[in-house]
Amino acid sequence: MKEPVWDEHADWWQREFTDGVDPEYVEQIIPLALEQVEGLDRVLDLGTGEGQLARAIVERQGGFVVGLDPTRSQIQVAQQRGGRVHYGLAGSDALPVADASFDAVVVCLVFEHVDALDASLTEVARVLRPGGRFVFFLNHPLLQTPDSGMIVDHMIEPPETYWRIGPYLPEAATVEEVQKDVRVRFVHRPLSRYVNGLIDAGLQLECMLEPAPPPGFIAKAGEYEHDVVRTTPRLLTLVARKPE
């Protein structure tokens, strides 16, 4: 799971996506995660980064919350930012955790950067107790494929705006310049790859959510103030359970 890019760009991630500055986290991801783990005492935030989701969970409901991430610079900042979270260094495909240790595992925008998907899902299933819940956030694998995005076609009158979908079925890794001089590696997989991976790991899919982009995101990205963007989900959430 460890990629040098996350050490290199840790400051960028912390500046742009944490500490309340990113509306998708504040208005959508964190509230959804809190809803899904409500009442569950032992929670693992896998790929915790600087820990904003883990902190939100422990602040809301207490309990025993662990944040694991393979990037040392992220974990160092997580520890500096405090909270009653237990942090550690680990990749998603080899967790230093005993079997059936957690009531819930949350993975947020992580596995689309991980090559070892099957091993990671197997580890998630291993550390969940029977009946435990897996909450899995990812960039929507159909609507956020490489080269997807809003297109304004000026070749017709009046101009037509639509959402272009890039190559969907091929499983491939790409490096995208997400901001000037910030290049991040993504692994695109079709949705069936994730669902079948859950099944192969022994997990049962219970719920799939495709929320519309939150108002704060639309307002922040002014060029996206169009119905085609408002009605095209950026996020996909899968909720699965380990059988009793």
Region spans (language model):
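A short glycine-rich, Lys/Arg-flanked "PGG" loop and its adjoining helix->strand segment in the class I
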Residues: 118-130
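Conserved class I S-adenosyl-L-methionine
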Residues: 1-39, 52-56, 74-77, 81, 133-173
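Short alpha-helix
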Residues: 172, 185-208
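Class I SAM-dependent methyltransferase SAM/SAH-binding core
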Residues: 44-46, 50-94
